[in-house]
């Protein structure tokens, strides 16, 4: 008699591993479990144990051998890996976490051998979740992976096996189903920043200081030589006051510089990949006396979504306040006229009031010139890049296959159907802009204030140490015309002051104006010795006007530069591929009719849009030039061709290629250009589809030259029973 024994075994295994590596540590764990149930028909027991698993075999003398088991199994694993690395400059740390889950349900059969067995079922599931984080000096990078896969196998087997050999009377059926999906999500963020700012206050240029010193020399020289050494105290006071004024000006208003830089890069990337596959397969293989049916179905889809954003910015701005602005020359002219007027109208023999007025006027002239028109420089830069990219890829495939292969005495049908869809959507936006503004005329050097101070001290030293009206000159070879005018003016002033101090009793002195610049002042009151000269009687006024005009021309140059440039680009791309196919194939013996049909169709569209705009503007001010440049672009092209049907009959403009040559028409498209001038917006819009393929389909034994409509952008391959093969490939411009 049969001995029925029920045995239940459960094995639980936990494994933990720890490992160390360079500058990091890792930990790995896994958990697994297994359970099996066996039925055996033998009095003797043979058991084996190896590596945590147990196996039991049953034998019944060789007459009958049956094995029934229930084998469910589950397993899981989780890993954690951390890496803190300081030795490498780019990476500060890295952490990775991975979690895997595995489940499996093993095949099982009933424990009673005398009864009809239940279907054997098997299945498995696997999941994987991963998260990675990386911290570096440039930012944080996060990425993750997630995948899951499952399968289920069902084998309904009803069979009675004996030694009598009647296998042909037993039907067999088998079905298998599987499905899987995969997802990948990745997100990356990168941020980088720096800042730059430049500020500086320049000092008067050497050229301006020379002009000012020459004019000051021509004014002070006659005062010193007018009354011998009687004005030494006033000159000393003037020297001390000017030094006292210039020293804090050099120290406090010296060149300063502050530097900082700001630039930003921001990148965000998101990607999603999805893959789904479902398949059902049913296979039946029997003897020739039994009909057989085979059905296979598969479904697959794949999706890819990618989103990327990139942003980069920088800014630049340069602004400078000109020392040679328009109102500065006016201030210089007005103050110089006041100084000369006071010197001219000074009472004879006493120039102390004139010196005091000169000191006040010089201070009044220099202070607004330095404070209001002092050189300042502020620098900043702005430029921006913005890029956004989005991509979506979708792939879907559905297929149904039915295969039957029997003997010649049985009809067979073979049907295959497939459906495929692929989508690619890509959106890209790129924006780039830059702006630059430069204002201010830089006529200053670093050592200009030192040169100004040294030259002024030399002049004052000569004024103080001059013996009784003789003052040595400071050689300035430049500006010969200015020197001659100043010397002429100084001669007029010296002659006027000397004659006013020595000849107070001259009653009526008429003034004359000649080319040599001789001055005979007219005194209204000879008793008090006061002198006055009207504007019409001043013989040196013309020379002074020439001096002021020359100084204004040299001193009043202004310049303003402004430049703005920008570029904006935006592109959008969409790719859609759809393929629907139905294939019916029957291949039997010669006694059975065979039919074959193949149909395939798929539109493919490629839409690309690009918009680009570039502009620049430049402005230069200061009385010289003003220039503005507008955007200029070219290349505007739009083509559209490639309709459904025979490409030999429908060819769009710009299509090059042989017509009706062979079984495949290929072509390309010419790109045109259009120059719209100096001010235009440019863009290109291309909508094109490539070449199609022709296929010959035949039934029976003779080939057919039937031309089926082929969709553009679709390639196919059809094999006919006669052995003739046609192929085609897509070509997209």
From Swiss-Prot:
Source organism superkingdom: Eukaryota
Disordered: region residues: 48-91, 172-204, 249-330, 369-450, 496-733
Signal peptide region: 1-20
Biased composition regions of type Gly residues, renumbered to the chain: 654-665
Gene name of the encoded protein: Muc19
Known tissue expression: Detected in terminal tubule cells of the submandibular gland (at protein level). Expressed in submandibular salivary glands of 3-day-old males but not adults. Expression in adult submandibular glands is restricted to females. Isoform 5 is expressed in both 3-day-old and adult sublingual glands.
Biased composition (Low complexity): 256-270, 376-390, 563-574, 609-619, 677-701
Main location per the UniProt record: secreted
Glycosylation sites recorded in the entry for this protein: 57, 141, 187, 327, 447, 514, 528, 611, 686, 696
Protein name: Submandibular gland protein C
PTM field: N-glycosylated.
């Amino acid at each position: 008699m049969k001995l029925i024994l029920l045995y239940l075994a459960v094995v639980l295994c936990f494994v933990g591993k720890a490992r160390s590596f360079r500058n990091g540590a890792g930990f790995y764990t896994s958990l697994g479990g297994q359970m099996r149930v066996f039925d055996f028909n033998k009095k003797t027991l043979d058991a084996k144990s190896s590596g945590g698993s147990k196996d039991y075999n049953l034998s019944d003398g060789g007459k009958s051998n049956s094995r029934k088991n229930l084998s469910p199994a589950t397993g899981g694993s989780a890993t954690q890996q951390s890496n803190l690395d300081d030795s490498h400059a780019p990476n500060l740390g890295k952490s990775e976490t991975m979690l895997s889950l595995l489940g499996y349900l093993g095949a099982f059969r009933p424990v009673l051998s005398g009864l009809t067995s239940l279907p054997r079922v098997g299945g498995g599931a696997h999941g994987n979740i991963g998260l990675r984080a990386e911290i570096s000096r440039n930012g944080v990078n996060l990425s993750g992976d997630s995948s899951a896969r499952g399968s289920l196998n069902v084998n309904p087997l009803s069979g009675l096996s004996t030694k009598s050999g009647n296998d042909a009377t037993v039907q067999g059926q088998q079905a298998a189903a599987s499905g899987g999906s995969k997802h990948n999500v990745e997100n990356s963020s990168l941020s980088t920043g720096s800042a730059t700012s430049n500020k500086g206050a320049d000092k008067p240029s050497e050229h301006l200081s020379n002009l000012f010193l020459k004019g000051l020399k021509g004014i002070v020289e006659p005062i010193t030589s007018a009354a011998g050494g009687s004005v030494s105290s006033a000159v000393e006071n003037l020297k001390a006051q000017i030094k006292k004024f210039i020293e804090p000006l050099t120290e406090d208003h010296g060149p300063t510089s502050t530097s900082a830089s700001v630039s930003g890069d921001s990148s965000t990337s998101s990607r999603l990949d999805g893959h789904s596959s479902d398949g059902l397969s049913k296979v039946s293989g029997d003897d020739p006396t039994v009909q057989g049916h085979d059905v296979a179905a598969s479904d697959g889809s794949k999706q890819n979504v990618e989103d990327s954003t990139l942003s980069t910015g920088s800014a630049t701005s340069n602004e400078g306040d000109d020392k040679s602005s328009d109102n500065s020359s006016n201030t210089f002219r007005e103050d110089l006229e006041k100084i000369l007027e006071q010197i001219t109208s000074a009472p004879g023999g006493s120039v102390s009031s004139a010196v005091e007025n000169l000191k006040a006027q010089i201070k009044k002239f220099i202070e607004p010139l330095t404070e209001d028109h002092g050189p300042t420089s502020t620098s900043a830069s702005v430029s921006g890049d913005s890029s956004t990219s989005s991509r979506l890829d979708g792939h879907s495939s559905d297929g149904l296959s039915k295969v039957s292969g029997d003997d010649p005495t049985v009809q067979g049908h073979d049907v295959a159907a497939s459906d495929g869809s692929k989508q690619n959507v890509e959106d890209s936006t790129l924006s780039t802009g830059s702006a630059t503004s430069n204002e201010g005329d830089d006529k200053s050097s670093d050592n200009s204030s030192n040169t100004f101070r040294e030259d002024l001290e030399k002049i004052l030293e000569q004024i103080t140490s001059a013996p009784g009206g003789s003052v040595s000159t400071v050689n300035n070879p430049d500006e010969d015309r200015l020197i001659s005018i100043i010397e002429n003016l100084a001669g007029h002033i010296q002659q006027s002051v000397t004659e006013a101090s020595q000849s107070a009793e001259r009653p009526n002195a008429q003034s004359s104006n000649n080319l040599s610049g001789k001055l005979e002042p007219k005194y209204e009151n000879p008793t008090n010795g006061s002198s006055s000269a009207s504007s019409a009687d001043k013989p040196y006024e013309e020379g002074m006007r020439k001096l002021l005009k020359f100084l204004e021309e040299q001193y009043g140059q202004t310049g303003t530069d402004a430049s703005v440039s920008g570029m904006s680009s935006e592109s959008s791309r969409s790719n859609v591929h759809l393929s629907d196919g139905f294939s019916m194939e029957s291949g039997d013996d010669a006694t059975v009719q065979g039919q074959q049909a193949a149909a395939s169709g798929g539109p493919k569209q490629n839409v690309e849009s690009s918009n680009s705009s570039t502009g620049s503007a430049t402005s230069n001010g200061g009385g010289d030039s003003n220039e503005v440049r507008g955007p200029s672009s070219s290349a505007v092209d739009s083509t559209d061709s490639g309709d459904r049907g025979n490409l030999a009959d429908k060819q769009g403009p710009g299509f090059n290629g042989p017509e009706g040559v062979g079984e495949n028409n290929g072509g390309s498209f010419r790109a045109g250009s259009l120059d719209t001038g100096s001010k235009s917006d440019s863009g290109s819009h291309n909508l094109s589809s490539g070449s199609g393929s022709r296929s010959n389909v035949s039934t029976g034994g003779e080939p057919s030259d039937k031309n089926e409509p082929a969709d553009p952008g679709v390639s196919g391959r059809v094999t006919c029973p006669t052995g003739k093969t046609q192929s085609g490939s897509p070509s997209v411009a």
